[in-house]
Amino acid sequence: MSALDNRLFAKMNGIGNEIVVVDLRDQPAPVTPDDARAVAAHVPYDQLMLLQPARLPGTEAFVRIYNNDGSESGACGNGMRCVARQLFAGSDQQGLTFETRAGLLNCWRGPAEGLFTVDMGAPKFGWQDIPLAEEFRDTRGIELQIGPIDAPILHTPSVVSMGNPHAIFWVDDIHAYDLGQFGPLLENHPIFPERANITLAHIVDRQHITMRTWERGAGLTRACGSAACATAVAAARLRRTDRIVEMTLPGGKLTIEWREGDDHVLMTGGAELEFEGRFDPALFVGACDTTAA
């Protein structure tokens, strides 16, 4: 028996990032990695957002995030906007606070109808915090490359943690590289002991970046909110952009602000409800991993 048997779910997307949201606040039973994989086989998604009972005063829920391969993620900005949209519906609330593995995240209604803003917290740049397998004093560009030493195909990525590890390769054309080929190699490179999200990014001007991402545990994605945050921050660290930028991803646009003062990263974008349904218990027959979520 699974905690997801007969549970209602919402299939959503955050500018193309495929999200499934399940409210389990009334049922604190464990959900397993096998359950998460079973859901992905039935309702394809990039991230599964599980709302579990709040553990801290002042929070709406503890949000556990699964990738479609059954691994867990500490943060998913697009998913949090989808969660916020669901909970704001039919409510006059202006803001919500959630707990995740990466810490507390605040969400509020955006500047226009259908937009939502998530405070993703402050980025981390220390090699131990990302984490990396060896010491790098300057994470604005680390020694890592794909291809021949004298003619690398991709090289010298910036690395950032937004609650999960990100590597950003700066390129002139984000479509000139087979990210489906290089993505899994770089995601699983030994330098990243917890694997990494891999992004190709092109700086158009000081207020605009285009990007594509191979998402850790999910693969090629039309949008990755935490990658957009990491990329915007990395570009600003290099002094190549301002601290407020428009990010163009395959699935749409996000506005990212790396706020002065507290260094928190604010992400604003849309969230759409595609359909709602109920899980058939037959999906979880054989999902026998008993690791509690």
Curated annotation (Swiss-Prot):
Its main location: cytoplasm. The keyword Isomerase applies. This is Diaminopimelate epimerase. It catalyses: (2S,6S)-2,6-diaminopimelate = meso-2,6-diaminopimelate. Belongs to the diaminopimelate epimerase family. GO terms for biological process: lysine biosynthetic process via diaminopimelate. Catalyzes the stereoinversion of LL-2,6-diaminopimelate (L,L-DAP) to meso-diaminopimelate (meso-DAP), a precursor of L-lysine and an essential component of the bacterial peptidoglycan. SUPFAM superfamilies: Diaminopimelate epimerase-like (SSF54506). InterPro entries: DAP_epimerase_AS (IPR018510), DAP_epimerase_DapF (IPR001653). It comes from the Bacteria. Homodimer. The record marks 166, 215 as: Could be important to modulate the pK values of the two catalytic cysteine residues. PANTHER family: DIAMINOPIMELATE EPIMERASE, DIAMINOPIMELATE EPIMERASE, CHLOROPLASTIC. The lineage of its organism: Bacteria, Pseudomonadati, Pseudomonadota, Alphaproteobacteria, Hyphomicrobiales. Substrate binds at residues 17, 47, 67, 77-78, 164, 197, 215-216, 225-226. Keywords: Amino-acid biosynthesis, Cytoplasm, Isomerase, Lysine biosynthesis. It is found in: Cytoplasm. GO terms for molecular function: diaminopimelate epimerase activity. The keyword Ubl conjugation does not apply. GO terms for cellular component: cytosol. Its EC number is 5.1.1.7. Pathway: Amino-acid biosynthesis; L-lysine biosynthesis via DAP pathway; DL-2,6-diaminopimelate from LL-2,6-diaminopimelate: step 1/1. The active site is at 76 (proton donor), 224 (proton acceptor).
